[in-house]
UniProtKB/Swiss-Prot annotation:
Other information: The reaction produces a racemic mixture of D-glycero-alpha-D-manno-heptose 7-phosphate and D-glycero-beta-D-manno-heptose 7-phosphate.
Annotated protein name in UniProt: Phosphoheptose isomerase
EC number(s) from the headed UniProt entry: 5.3.1.28
Organism classification: Bacteria, Pseudomonadati, Pseudomonadota, Gammaproteobacteria, Enterobacterales
CDD domains: SIS_GmhA
Amino acids binding Zn(2+): 61, 65, 172, 180
Gene (name only): gmhA
Length: 192
């Protein structure tokens, strides 16, 4: 009944991954991002992560597997997803939704910390403002984007971009793979 649809969806997902893998710059960017994050942790820094909708869930997933665990038991790493509902509702009400992440970065971000900003379009105003706030604090910035990188293109120390111009879910599928690989590489870097 739906077998053709299922095959088409899985084939499109595989094609998106294959296109991402064709560009060696993506592989190098993932490696550089993992080293940057591990170096921050080793120096006493932390990572703040943010995004909207599914990207917000990815930001929380990233932080959870750093503070909790991924595949093996090991010490937790300092990671915070900007996801506190009382903070988000307060800032949305008092300043506007575009400031929900930047106000948090201003409050807890420090030089030597890292911001991971996630946006499938690269055009999320609140993530863009968080990047600006991170820069003001002397933080490093890693972005996970899609399409052509949108307004976030060129704003990060390291951008990992999924060059897919279709639906956002295909970009998110690659983002979660990248997140898992980042965690795996961070774990290896932390025991060096």
């Amino acid at each position: 009944m739906y077998q053709d649809l299922i095959r088409n969806e899985l084939n499109e997902a595989a094609e998106t991954l294959a296109n991402f893998l064709k560009d060696d710059a993506n592989i190098h960017a993932i490696q550089r991002a993992a080293v940057l994050l591990a170096d921050s942790f080793k120096a006493g820094g932390k990572v703040l992560s943010c995004g909207n909708g599914g990207s917000h869930c990815d930001a929380m997933h990233f932080a959870e597997e750093l503070t909790g665990r991924y595949r093996e038991n090991r010490p937790g790493y300092p990671a915070i997803a900007i996801s506190d509902v009382s903070h988000i509702s307060c800032v949305s009400n008092d300043f506007g939704y575009d400031y929900i992440f930047s106000r948090y970065v201003e409050a807890v971000g420090r030089e030597g910390d890292v911001l991971l900003g996630i946006s499938t379009s690269g055009n999320s105003g609140n993530v863009i403002k968080a990047i600006a706030a991170a820069r003001e604090k002397g933080m490093k910035v890693i972005t996970l984007t899609g399409k052509d990188g949108g307004k976030m293109a060129g704003t990060a120390d390291i951008e990992i971009r999924v060059p897919h111009f279709g639906y956002a879910d295909r970009i998110q599928e690659i983002h979660i793979k990248v997140i898992h690989i980042l965690i795996q590489l961070i774990e290896k870097e932390m025991v060096k």
